[in-house]
Amino acid sequence: MSRACELTGKAVMSGNNVSHANNKTRRRFLPNLCDVTLMSEALGQSYRLRVSANALRSVEHRGGLDAFLLKAKSNELSQRARLLKKQVAKKLTEQTEA
């Protein structure tokens, strides 16, 4: 399981701890990842995703998983999220046509 957000692509970064004496030691900055279950209204199913706390706030701000996925850039999404985005878009176009 990678340490990257499935919705925003946030991943591990590296940098330095810098002491008061300006000594630098390498460190890793880990994203704040949460295992959450999000509901898709269009598909009527819940999905388990590993997302950052920031992405979780963005999902709620945009009005749910479906709205977030439709507005998100595909290159930031994980493979699973891209597939989910495609399914949601297909389902919504079917509903608007009917």
Swiss-Prot record:
Keywords: Ribonucleoprotein, Ribosomal protein. One of its GO terms (cellular component) is cytosolic large ribosomal subunit. GO terms for biological process: translation. It comes from the Bacteria. Gene3D superfamilies: Ribosomal protein L28/L24 (2.30.170.40). SUPFAM superfamilies: L28p-like (SSF143800). One of its GO terms (molecular function) is structural constituent of ribosome. The keyword Ribosomal protein applies. Disulfide bonds: none annotated. It holds the Pfam family Ribosomal_L28. NCBIfam families: L28. Belongs to the bacterial ribosomal protein bL28 family. This is Large ribosomal subunit protein bL28. It comes from Chelativorans sp. (strain BNC1).
